[in-house]
């Protein structure tokens, strides 16, 4: 290139190094311990199956058991049995106006039915509304019931004002009474106010609930033992997978070749594990981790290093998807381009063996779309152009990366058929809602840092200019957009649905990762020390004490 390296002014971001070094490459497989745990879990599974069968005739008892299994993180062993139970119970059309069903029970049943796609009406909460249309004052002493109502309200859809009111009432009251509640309820309330169950990462929530359940006087020691064993067994599997992707990442050696990019392979695996933690998704987790890691480098190349002449060429090279394009590329990005094409060659070979090579095609096309949108953003930055909010959002829904990551989350899922990829390519309502959440929450968390780096074409800036709004008003509007998008996701997860529940759950879980990663308006991916490090240690380093 005519321009020398010295003359190039690059938008360097100076990202912090990895927190983990080679920690996960030095992995003790723990094969003997895993085998021992496996046998114990299989024995305990039989006993739990008996418990599920025994609770057949008692609605309240059975629903409490299902909730406990789900919160302890062991319900995936009994998905078929739980779905059968819930289908049966929902068909009973229980009269929840009966005084024998208290607020805790009604809220719990509502949440469980909604979580599993059943269209139970929010009108069942009407009996707790007074003549002025407010929730009754007497509920303020019912901490357990209010917590159950609070968690249920996060399953609301658009137009359910009774649940909007329920969330406001329960949140305010729980904040007020939390210091006066006894443990473990107080701990559960404090945690829920920070991290609502429906928005949380299932493994993190299971880890937290196991410690809370252990304090419960009414706990079932048998279930507690099962949950701990299973948690540690899954952790062993996840550590093996993390070892594999960490070794792959180290062998690529892109950290030394592209020192400007974020070194976040462990955090990328954390994201993939949040999308699916169950054993049968092992290959899918590894494939998704690799695609997220590579996307992170592309993002940083456009956002934090490349100049427009280089990015023009790189965008064309991705569009043409041909190894011969390497000769045209800037030297620094050649190793990455080669590694990216080779990764997808491996994917295609593996998927072709099971007749699913089309999955790689859809992923590549989605990546091309992402890169085109990154290129648009880069040109805005270079030109100092601040687009109208509508124009910004159209492009930014793609650069949030979730279009691409939802597609690549299905690469290793054998049950995902071509129709699923075609559905995602059409940008259905469920996916768009997910993209909105990812975009606006990311924009809130990264606004100040991007502003410091001279990024003018941000969503917050665009919205403020278009609407003559303050930063506080813009942030409030973005949270409102996210809240409405969550309502749309909840609606789209309800039955009947023509779409695969397996695919819907991938989108839902991707949004949960956003809620966790950007908790407290922090960018936990770029700066993982505060937000993600404690979770990663709990999930992949320290086993639960038996």
From Swiss-Prot:
Residues annotated for Mg(2+) 1 binding in this entry: 299, 303
Top-level lineage group: Eukaryota
Binding site for Mg(2+) 3: 442, 446, 450
Cofactor note: Binds 3 Mg(2+) ions per subunit.
Keywords: Lyase, Magnesium, Metal-binding
Motif DDXXD motif, residue numbers: 299-303
Binding site for Mg(2+) 2: 299, 303
Catalytic activity: (2E,6E)-farnesyl diphosphate = (-)-5-epi-eremophilene + diphosphate
Induction of expression: Induced by abscisic acid (ABA).
GO molecular function, one term: terpene synthase activity
SS bond partners: none
Known cofactor(s): Mg(2+)
Binding partners and assembly: Monomer.
Protein family membership: Belongs to the terpene synthase family. Tpsa subfamily.
Recorded domain comment: The Asp-Asp-Xaa-Xaa-Asp/Glu (DDXXD/E) motif is important for the catalytic activity, presumably through binding to Mg(2+).
Name of the featured protein: (-)-5-epieremophilene synthase STPS3
Organism whose genome encodes this protein: Salvia miltiorrhiza
Highest classification ranks of the organism: Eukaryota, Viridiplantae, Streptophyta, Embryophyta, Tracheophyta
